[in-house]
C-alpha cells in the first residue's frame, strides 16, 4: 500500500508546487524526476544493508524499521517544500530505500526461509500478490479517495494527505508489532 502511495503521488505532489510563484523555478519543481531518482539510488544501497540488519535485529525489527521509515518518508513529504524545505524532500527520498527494501526484500526472505520447498513458490507468489496486487489496488483506491477528499477545484491539501498516509503507516506498524510473532529460530 505504502509503495503505491509513494509511486502514485510523490511526483504529482512535488510538481504541484509549480503553481506557487515562490517555488515555480526551484530545482525540485523543475527536476522532480531527478529528485525522486534519489529513492532508487537509496534502494540500491539499502539492499546491501539487509543481511547485516537481519542478522543483528531479526525479521520483526527489520520490518518494523521499514514501517517506521514509511512514516518518516510520508511525514517528511508533508512537511517539506522545494524551496527551503527541499532537504526534507531529499531525506524522504533517501529514507525510501530503507522503507522499500527492509519490507519487501526481508519479507520475501522470511517467506523463503519459513516455508517448505513444496509450497515455497506458491507462498512467494501469495506474498507478492498481497503486497503488489491486492495491497496495491486497495492502496491506490484508498489513497485516491483521500486525495480527492482533500482537493477543492485544482488545489490539493497535500500536507494533510501525506500526514494521513504517515498515520496509516504508523497504525499498520503498531498492529504488525502486536500480531507478528516469528518463531525464535527464524527471527534472526
Predicted regions mapped to residue ranges:
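Extracytoplasmic gate region of multi-pass secondary transporters
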Residues: 1-33
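Loop-to-transmembrane helix entry/capping segments in MFS-fold secondary transporters
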Residues: 29, 115-128
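Helix-to-loop junctions at the C-terminal end of transmembrane segments
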Residues: 45-59, 147
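C-terminal ends and interior cores of transmembrane alpha-helices
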Residues: 69-82
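Hydrophobic core of transmembrane alpha-helices in multi-pass small-molecule transporters
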Residues: 87-102
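Intracellular juxtamembrane helix-capping segments at the cytosolic ends
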Residues: 102-116
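A membrane-interface helix-boundary motif in multi-pass transporters
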Residues: 145-169
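Multi-pass alpha-helical transporter architecture, strongest
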Residues: 161-188
Amino acid at each position: 500500500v505504502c509503495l503505491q502511495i509513494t509511486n502514485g503521488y510523490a511526483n504529482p505532489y512535488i510538481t504541484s508546487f509549480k503553481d506557487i510563484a515562490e517555488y515555480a523555478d526551484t530545482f525540485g519543481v523543475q527536476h522532480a524526476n531527478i529528485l525522486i531518482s534519489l529513492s532508487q539510488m537509496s534502494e540500491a544501497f539499502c539492499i546491501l544493508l539487509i543481511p547485516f540488519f537481519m542478522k543483528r535485529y531479526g525479521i520483526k525489527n527489520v520490518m518494523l524499521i521499514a514501517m517506521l521509515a514509511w512514516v518518516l518518508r510520508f511525514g517528511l513529504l508533508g512537511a517539506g517544500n522545494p524551496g527551503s524545505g527541499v532537504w526534507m524532500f531529499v531525506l524522504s527520498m533517501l529514507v525510501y530505500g530503507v522503507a522499500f527494501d527492509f519490507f519487501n526484500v526481508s519479507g520475501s526472505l522470511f517467506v523463503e526461509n519459513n516455508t517448505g520447498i513444496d509450497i515455497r513458490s506458491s507462498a512467494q507468489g501469495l506474498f507478492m500478490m498481497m503486497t503488489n496486487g491486492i495491497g496495491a489496488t486497495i492502496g491506490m483506491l484508498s489513497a485516491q479517495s483521500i486525495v480527492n477528499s482533500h482537493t477543492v477545484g485544482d488545489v490539493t491539501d497535500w500536507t494533510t494527505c501525506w500526514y494521513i498516509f504517515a498515520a496509516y503507516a504508523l497504525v499498520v506498524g503498531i498492529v504488525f508489532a502486536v500480531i507478528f510473532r516469528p518463531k525464535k529460530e527464524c527471527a534472526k
